């Protein structure tokens, strides 16, 4: 093989400077053509391959940016030592190492397995492939050996070529087969004796067992054939009798169940009628009760209408409103009369919503003494007001409420059953001093 070196390396040559080496490696690696190694021989392939390993790969292909100079020099010396080992152990003996195919793969495209800065990993892998002692041999027979094999009886010429045990071992020579002949005969004699006894026992047992089984089966069949009609009739008679008895028992049970169900249904119907009658009585009582409640509601409505008219006809001598919460509505209908009593100066009262739908007055501690003193006066006045209220209620129902009427809070002398009415939506015409009166509505 010519060792022509190229100064300008083509990009498609994978960094290999020898054209002949590039073509050989591409044929071996890509196409798997091993004959190129046989035809070229170690004398032409190994020199260019060793030069590519020791010079091109460490300096032109890989770079060591992370490693120090000492590490790079160590890797280069290791590659030089591998080249010397290949030269001394294989090139001088005119043979290839048995790992030559893997060495060709690593040298043809090292970046397929390692990165550009992983020279140390590449050197480790190459050392494992090169540090061997076995040589690579191709078992190709010459023309003379083929003629001798044709003359001899070859065991490979058999009908069943798939049996690997009958294939001839290629590295076995005639001398080896002659030495193994007595040993093989002894093994065959032992195996044949053991297999012979086993086969005879199996054959005898097989025939005896089959004959006994066949005779037994025949006798059983004859017995069954003789007693077949009797056995079948007896079986079906027993089965039919059992079925008839079962059907009769089931019919009686069904009839008893039907009668029980009918009696239960009749009892249920009677209970339903009683329930309906009781329900009708309860409905009548509910209707009576509803009628009485309706009358009570009418009386309550009349009483509330009278109270509403009473609220409208009160004098404008109103007391100050109760002490309010931030969420309560304002009432600025203050009293402008010149006369003020002690009751006017007391703490405002608080109205409590009772369960009857009316408001009751909760008096403050300051006004409790004054109210106790005036209790007798209020009792007499309340009796007179009740008489007037009955007359005014009759008039208030006929007159009704005008749309422009205003609601006024009750006075301190009014009864506790007076009702407060919301003042939302009322125009404050008379209260000019009210803060809400100045606000545009």
UniProtKB/Swiss-Prot annotation:
Annotated Basic and acidic residues bias: 388-398
Q: Localized where?
A: Nucleus
Q: Which GO terms describe its molecular function?
A: protein phosphatase regulator activity
Output the superkingdom of the source species. Eukaryota
Where are the annotated segments for Disordered?
201-220, 242-348, 364-418
The alphabetized UniProt keywords are:
Nucleus, Phosphoprotein
Tell me the residues on which Phosphothreonine occurs.
Answer: 347
Ranges annotated as biased composition (Acidic residues): 201-213, 264-302
- Name a GO CC annotation attached to this entry: nucleus
Q: Which GO terms describe its biological process?
A: meiotic recombination checkpoint signaling; negative regulation of DNA damage checkpoint
| Entry keyword annotation includes Ribosomal protein | no
Database matches in PANTHER family: PPP4R2-RELATED PROTEIN, PROTEIN PHOSPHATASE 4 REGULATORY SUBUNIT 2-RELATED
Misc. comment: Present with 1010 molecules/cell in log phase SD medium.
How this chain assembles, per its entry, is: Regulatory subunit (R2) of the histone H2A phosphatase complex (HTP-C) consisting of PPH3, PSY2 and PSY4. Interacts with SPT4 and SPT5.
Q: What is the name attached to this protein's record?
A: Serine/threonine-protein phosphatase 4 regulatory subunit 2
Which species is listed as the source?
Saccharomyces cerevisiae (strain ATCC 204508 / S288c) (Baker's yeast)
Taxonomic path: Eukaryota, Fungi, Dikarya, Ascomycota, Saccharomycotina
